[in-house]
């Protein structure tokens, strides 16, 4: 019998990526106060990539303590230098994100941790780098107005799989990781564990 796979998240995009790749996974909310946890990590001056990894691990551990099989926890944070960006709270914050990112390169610290029986057993960190073209104020206003609240579900206030592709001049790294899930290394691990055929 194959191991059960659970995604410690209610993220529709992560579940859709798994399903499209042939991985059946239940989605379970990890019930983590992410804002408080992030604030503590930032107060301790942890690097952004370490913040993403610790939050991914916490999510997976919380759900794994209650669910059998493999539990996948993920987190993605945007790093502009040493500054971490969270998902924008509203459309005005989305505009501010885009103003700050305009004409610069940033990294999406995309962490994934798998836990089994409440303990972490596998980790992966992908660090795609994206370079945004210089954006005019008119473009930012029009872009945010046309995309609307969908931008509030992403750390950079863009969705690369849609009109967000217009924002960039260069992308280095795995497309799936940009979408929030380092899918290819995850699939490799699931094959090792015989969740997927080899």
Curated annotation (Swiss-Prot):
GO terms for cellular component: cytoplasm. Pfam families: Maf. Keywords: Cytoplasm, Hydrolase, Nucleotide metabolism. It catalyses: a ribonucleoside 5'-triphosphate + H2O = a ribonucleoside 5'-phosphate + diphosphate + H(+); a 2'-deoxyribonucleoside 5'-triphosphate + H2O = a 2'-deoxyribonucleoside 5'-phosphate + diphosphate + H(+). The active site is at residue 75. The keyword Mitochondrion does not apply. Its main location: cytoplasm. InterPro entries: ITPase-like_fam, Maf-like. It is found in: Cytoplasm. GO terms for molecular function: nucleoside triphosphate diphosphatase activity. One of its GO terms (biological process) is nucleotide metabolic process. The keyword Lipoprotein does not apply. Signal peptide: none annotated. Its EC number is 3.6.1.9. Its cofactor is a divalent metal cation. Belongs to the Maf family. Nucleoside triphosphate pyrophosphatase. May have a dual role in cell division arrest and in preventing the incorporation of modified nucleotides into cellular nucleic acids. PANTHER family: BIFUNCTIONAL DTTP/UTP PYROPHOSPHATASE/METHYLTRANSFERASE PROTEIN-RELATED, BIFUNCTIONAL DTTP_UTP PYROPHOSPHATASE_METHYLTRANSFERASE PROTEIN-RELATED. This is Nucleoside triphosphate pyrophosphatase. It comes from Hyphomonas neptunium (strain ATCC 15444).
């Amino acid at each position: 019998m194959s191991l059960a796979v659970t995604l410690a998240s209610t993220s529709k995009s992560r579940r859709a990526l798994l399903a499209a790749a042939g991985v059946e996974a239940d989605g379970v909310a990890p019930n983590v106060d992410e804002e408080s946890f992030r604030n503590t990590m930032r107060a301790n001056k942890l690097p952004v990539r370490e913040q993403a990894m610790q939050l991914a691990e916490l999510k997976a551990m919380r759900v794994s303590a209650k669910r059998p099989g493999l539990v996948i926890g993920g987190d993605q944070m945007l790093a502009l230098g040493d500054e971490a960006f969270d998902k924008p709270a509203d459309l005005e914050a989305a505009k501010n994100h885009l103003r700050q990112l305009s004409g610069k390169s940033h990294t999406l610290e995309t962490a994934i941790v798998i836990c089994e029986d409440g303990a972490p057993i596998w980790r992966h960190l992908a660090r795609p780098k994206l370079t945004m073209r210089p954006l005019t104020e008119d473009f930012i206003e029009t872009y945010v107005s046309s995309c609307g609240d969908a931008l509030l579900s992403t750390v950079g206030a863009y969705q690369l799989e849609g009109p967000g592709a217009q924002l960039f001049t260069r992308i280095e790294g795995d497309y799936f990781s940009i979408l929030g899930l380092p899918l290819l290394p995850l699939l490799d691990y699931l094959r090792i564990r015989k969740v997927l055929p080899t």
